[in-house]
Amino acid sequence: MNDGELREKALHLSSFIVEAPAGSGKTSLLTDRFLKLLTVVDMPEEIVAITFTKKAASEMKAKIIERIKESKSPFAQTILKRSEEKGWDIEHNLSRLKVMTIDKFCHNVVSQIPVLSKMGSKPNITDTPEKFYEESVKQTLQAKDGIEDIKVVFTHYDNEYEKINRRLVAMMSIRDQWKYRCNMLTQKSSGQIIEEGNAYLEHLTKPIYQKIRAELNQDQLNDLIEILHYLESTNLREDIKLKNKNSFNFDSEEIPLWQTITKILFTDKNTRRENITAREGFKNDDEGEIYKNKCRNLPNIDFLLAIKAIPEPLSETYALKLRSIANILLQCEKKLRQLFKQRNTVDFIEIIEIANEALGKNDAASDLLLSLDYKISHLLIDEFQDTSRSHFNFLKKIVDGWTPEAQKTIFCVGDPMQSIYKFREADVSIFIEAKKNGFNTIPLETIQLRDNYRSSSTIVNEINQIFENILPKEDLIQEGAVSYKPFVSAKKEHDSNVSEFKFHALTFTESTDIDTEEAKYVCNLIDTFPENEKIAILTRSRSHLSELINYIRKFKPTLKFNAVEIDALDKHQSIQDILSLSYAMLDLNDRIHWLAILRAPWCGIMLNDLALLFQNDHTSTVWEIIQDENKMSEISPDGRRRIRRLIDILKNAFDNQSKTHIRRLIESVWMNLGGELCLHNPNDIVDINKFFNILQTSSSPIAIDFELVEHQITKTYLSDIPSAEERIQFFTIHKAKGLEFDTVIIPSLNSTTRASDKKMIVSDTSVKNSRIFDITAFSEPDNKSPHLHDLIYGIEKSREENELKRLLYVAMTRAKTKLHLVGSVMHKDEIKPASNSFLSMLWNIYGNNFYEVKPIENIDIDIESSKIEEFVPKLMRLKLN
């Protein structure tokens, strides 16, 4: 079947999972499905469409509404007829169309059950819960209960308080991953933990042992035993204790012995050892030479190197430490829940957990679940590859008991090749599992689309050639790897000459500032495009954009651009002014912030007036001084008018302070002072509202937690809504997902991001021959290896590396007609890319390009202005009538 026929099939009243590449119109298909279902349901609320971002939810709902209002559309006519028959009045009751984020859906569930939710009322949701995490850890470490566990943890981590504190705080942000496991650990004996851990090690070593027995015959195994007995007799090694061993048992107890064998046969660089000496335990005599030759005569057994990563069998001490760490983590989680309840605030993890609890424990359906089941008949999930385990468990409970015969359907749409939200706990293996096993009890028929309606054939062909070499040939669930599925361009091209793909290889001399020179190169590249062409510049992280943005601001000010969520709120002068107003209103003695509000644009006192008022009085408060008529008579008439206006507004606010929530009080003062009139860009009001929302969630009716406010404004980013005149847009790749642009430039290919801290505990679950291996390990304070934690963490790193490949795929598939990749390297003795960079993935394809170009020392560019005033954001001083 072609794509058109498959899209038609996807509208049938059955359950499907649709796998479709970038630019294939997935959201449009889901919209069609929603509209089709509206023609058969009894109530619109029976259909629930779920996305993972507010933006996607609002866009999808807007599309559905637009289609319903298309009077000539067959869908619209049928839906409106159904609406009239059933009394929906859908045209005037658009809120009955249930399109929302997964977090909003969970929140709605929780809001129906305030008693079960343990919150008492509908909680606020915070996007920046870090301060809650920090406080919960602080309270746990200062508590008297659990002191023995705290001692064990601190002893294990060498009493490094800062490191322990930082890692515990980090664990709070992923507590849904470990809470269940930690609860289970605290109920197990040391013997159980040791037995399960060693069984896991045997599970990992079994394939290595099988390979040894397949590659080495009995004579060669006997030679190895003889070599070991000889080395034990020389007393030159301390790591061989055979105890009359005459054969190999191939069990977990032998892991250290096989690791010793790898040290004897291989160098630290994992190459076969040619020069065997006394360092390996061999004497320099005839007998020693015999056993050296036995080593040399062994066949190629490089596969044995894998056993180097296997740790020694677990011990009683290990089990004790693991339980203590689990207890501390659970105490932190308990304190966090108490803090959430006190503040009536939760994070997204808490919402999903409360929702899961509310929907029944131990798979028993609660009354609420039965109620929801009655209401919901069709579940549609967009971007299904971004689902986390917690979300998936929640959704499975929603559809618990559904059967195909009941005319209830599930419709999942997504592209595993665009799964890039691991940092939000998205698990791409869920998509793969659902294709294979269905959604809970509902089997899903797979629909595979191939057409791309976004990109030109030139770009599609290049992307296919690149990613067929980068992504694997088959899905590897444990490693979080998804196979590459080529797609085809369905775009009608009027002029194929307009489309282009180019890789820019830049090699610089050692003395060059690569970031600055690459920024110049990209500026020159932008100048080559027509002025009416929209350009997107995409990078892995915000920091990769900073040099280019600063360069344009300073030297190319005529290039109009917007940078989407690149700068934090605390970088916005208007936000700083409102923050000063907040500090000042709650503390009359805060001289610095009172002076700041006098200088703010909505007050606008000149420096000369400030000097006259305050230079001789360092003890009175600012509030007292500005109400002193003698001192006020010394300043300019304009200054007096401005200050008297400020006093009138503040006096009114202070009189009503006890009657109004502090957020509303400060917001009304700012508005009355003319704060909105002083904004340089009218769109700035969006970010001002973000600040006031932070103030709301960080305050009681009469007080503000300023430490929390200051923290949150560093973690919340400016919106920068694009205007028509801004032809250049800067995005991180994650922010650009779902968007498309005429021209895409991907610079900083050789840049990397900071490695994440090791998690305090990690877990792995694998199934072999119907046996489930579920293991948890804790991190070690030193770099000695191997550790069980490092072994499992290695699997985690593989998943991150595979996601990084998909991130590049997402970036490249944003382009419609032009795609430019820019990579820069330093010319040294050896030209090579940075590990864990986009360029390292592309090196096998484009690496030779860097050897074919002459090293650059400096790139010429036409600088428009270097005046510092062009670099400083403009402020507007309020004009008094």
Language model segments and positions:
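Conserved ATP-driven helicase/translocase motor core recognized via long
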Residues: 21, 167-346, 520, 546, ...
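P-loop NTPase Walker
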Residues: 1-117, 222, 234, 243, ...
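Anion-coordinating catalytic cores for phosphoryl-, nucleotidyl-, and glycosidic chemistry
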Residues: 548, 566, 795, 800-812
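Core structural elements
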Residues: 97-107, 156-177, 325-331, 346-351, ...
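Accessory alpha-helical DNA-binding modules that contact the DNA backbone or grooves
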Residues: 616-649
